[in-house]
A protein has these predicted regions:
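Catalytic-loop of the protein kinase fold
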Residues: 35-52
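Activation segment/activation loop of eukaryotic-type protein kinase catalytic domains
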Residues: 47-83
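Activation segment signature within eukaryotic-like protein kinase domains
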Residues: 23-24
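C-terminal lobe substrate-recognition/regulatory segment of protein kinase catalytic domains
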Residues: 140-207
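Protein kinase subdomain VIII
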Residues: 80-93
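Regulatory extensions flanking the kinase catalytic core
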Residues: 217-244
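Conserved structural core of kinase catalytic domains
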Residues: 1-19
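Conserved catalytic-loop aspartate of Hanks-type protein kinases
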Residues: 100
């Protein structure tokens, strides 16, 4: 492999779906293999996505650093990089196979719009955990579909981070009370704007939306994602490009 996803920023407008398809496919297959062994990967991030042929019609992707895998059901609050951490891990439920699936949605979001998740735009005024969690809440949580908070038995640090993140979501800027400190949009708003401006192919947005389900009970497994209409559409778009 020649490089990593960390070193290959998306070029917006995103005119090719081939690299997106390669990353999604490699990640999902890695998650399926881990799940068959009762393991979770826990460490999907751009530097662990190995790439080759990125300038050609059929780029290849492979997931590296597989040695960090652990048994499914790890009850550890700090698993997964903060930018790509699943809601149930933030809530101290546990880290399961579907937590890996969430991390792929977050990874693709981060690749397409660097800073929409994670700590990139934090000026240091807030702890990274609080900043990352608040952005996750702004992107995906609603009044009727919130991120489940940690239980009373979770670590006090996590409980406090969750409470402070909730406050940060609606906190106004000191220099302009009409503006939020966080300018992160909701995912649907972001995706609609990206599609309307012809910045991101619909098949890529649909794939992310299919994976990024807050409730893990309703989130697809990696195996289900590989046979989904969303992945088939992404695959077909990439195949069409390679022929062209």
């Amino acid at each position: 492999m020649d490089t990593t996803l960390e070193d290959v920023p998306a070029v917006i407008p995103l005119r090719s779906t081939a690299l997106a398809k390669a990353v999604v496919e490699a990640s999902l297959h890695a998650f399926v293999a881990a799940d068959q062994e009762g393991l979770v990967y826990t460490d999907l991030k751009p530097s662990n996505v190995l790439l080759s042929g990125v300038d050609g019609p059929s780029p290849q992707a492979k997931i590296g650093d597989l040695g960090v895998m652990g048994p499914e059901g790890l009850n550890e609050s700090w698993l997964q990089p903060e930018a790509f951490r699943a809601p149930e891990v933030w809530g101290s439920v546990s880290c399961y196979h579907k937590s890996d699936v969430w991390s792929l949605a977050a990874l693709m979001l981060n690749w397409i719009d660097n800073g929409i998740v994670g700590n990139h735009d934090n000026n240091g005024s807030f702890p990274p955990m609080i900043w990352c969690l608040a952005k996750l809440m702004r992107l995906f949580a609603t009044e009727n579909n919130p991120i489940v908070p940690p239980s009373s038995t979770a670590s006090k640090d996590l409980q406090l981070s969750f409470e402070y993140a909730k406050k940060l979501v609606s906190a106004a800027r000191a220099d302009n009370p009409k503006q939020y400190i966080l300018d992160t949009p909701g995912f649907d708003e972001w995706a609609a704007a990206a599609e309307a401006a012809d910045l991101i192919p619909k098949v890529v947005l649909d794939m992310i939306r299919f994976l990024a389900i807050l409730d893990p009970a309703n989130r697809p497994t990696a195996a289900q994602a590989l046979v989904s209409n969303e992945f088939k559409a992404l695959e077909a778009a990439a195949a069409l490009e390679s022929k062209g």
